[in-house]
Swiss-Prot record:
Native source organism of the sequence: Cupriavidus metallidurans (strain ATCC 43123 / DSM 2839 / NBRC 102507 / CH34)
Binding site for ATP: G64, A65, S66, G67, S68, G69, K70, S71
The UniProt record lists the keyword Translocase: yes
PROSITE patterns listed in its UniProt record: ABC_TRANSPORTER_1, ABC_TRANSPORTER_2, LOLD
The protein's assembly and partners: The complex is composed of two ATP-binding proteins (LolD) and two transmembrane proteins (LolC and LolE).
UniProt protein name: Lipoprotein-releasing system ATP-binding protein LolD
Disordered: region residues: 1-23
Keyword entries, A-Z: ATP-binding, Cell inner membrane, Cell membrane, Membrane, Nucleotide-binding, Translocase, Transport
One example of a Gene Ontology biological process annotation: lipoprotein localization to outer membrane
Gene Ontology MF annotations: ATP binding; ATP hydrolysis activity; transmembrane transporter activity
Domain ABC transporter: 28-249
The organism's taxonomic lineage, starting at the top: Bacteria, Pseudomonadati, Pseudomonadota, Betaproteobacteria, Burkholderiales
Compartments, as annotated in UniProt: Cell inner membrane
SUPFAM superfamilies: P-loop containing nucleoside triphosphate hydrolases (SSF52540)
Length: 249
């Protein structure tokens, strides 16, 4: 089976808008996002009043030079870091202002994350790695594993679910990471250089998979990448430069 082969949806279907979310409400909205860091005794402002909107099912690429603040922006949008100014709304509801415990709950239910390095736990099987967010959510082990198996089938790894990360190829490990990001049926997946550690052929297959899953499941993706060819396949391309986002396409 190729890296881009998807199996039938079966019981797995991601949700984009939660109950009570008005039609047309952006999945993710950042307004006036500002972030500063101390560097060499100086305040460095990496985000300067950034505005960004992501709609349901939309694929948005963020490009820019190394150190321009792309990962910082992704962390702020995902509630992993707090902005110095501005706010983030998730599914039309305040996200930045939530207390950390409540924000963690909302993040677990509405967002997925994929990183350059897969961050899979080496002692656990692919199935148990993917099931972990559902166990954190409070599902029983059998129920969490059933959800995990369904999404592994969706990414073409149903037959590899009992393998540990060390027994999988680089592309397979990243597909497991994508499955883990999707198992909770998030409205949006935030991906930080998800193909950065892969060769060109494998990277292309993983990228194809993410775009196809976005199309078939209606999940929004925000993808930070240095690969302009891959970025060009998204619905929009935004460039982060001098702390501001500029729309390139």
């Amino acid at each position: 089976m190729s890296d881009t082969t998807l199996l039938p949806e079966a019981s797995f279907q991601a949700g984009t808008q939660g109950p009570g979310t008005p039609t047309g409400t952006p999945v993710l909205l950042g307004e006036g996002l500002t972030k500063r860091f101390k560097q060499g005794g100086l305040d460095v402002e990496v985000l300067r009043g950034v505005d960004v909107r992501v709609d349901a099912g939309e694929k948005v690429a963020i490009v820019g030079a190394s150190g321009s603040g792309k990962s910082t922006l992704l962390h702020v949008l995902g509630g992993l870091d707090n902005p110095d100014a501005g706010r983030v709304a998730l599914l039309g509801k305040p996200f930045t202002a939530l207390r950390e415990k409540q924000r963690n709950i909302v993040r677990n239910r509405s967002l997925g994350f994929v990183y350059q390095f897969h961050h899979l736990l080496p002692e656990f099987t692919a199935l148990d790695n993917v099931a972990m967010p559902m166990r954190i959510r409070g599902l029983s082990e059998p129920a969490a594993r059933a959800e995990a198996q369904a999404v592994l089938e969706r990414v073409g790894l149903g037959g590899r679910s009992k393998h540990r990360p060390g027994e999988l190829s680089g592309g397979e490990r990243q597909r497991v990471a994508i499955a883990r990001a999707l198992v909770g049926k998030p409205a949006c997946v935030l991906a930080d250089e998800p193909t950065g550690n892969l060769d060109d052929h494998t990277a292309g297959g993983v990228y194809d998979l993410m775009l196809e899953l976005s199309r078939t499941l209606g999940t929004s993706f925000v993808i930070v990448t240095h690969d302009l060819d891959l970025a060009g396949r998204c619905d929009r391309v935004l460039r982060l430069r001098d702390g501001h986002l500029h729309q390139e396409r």
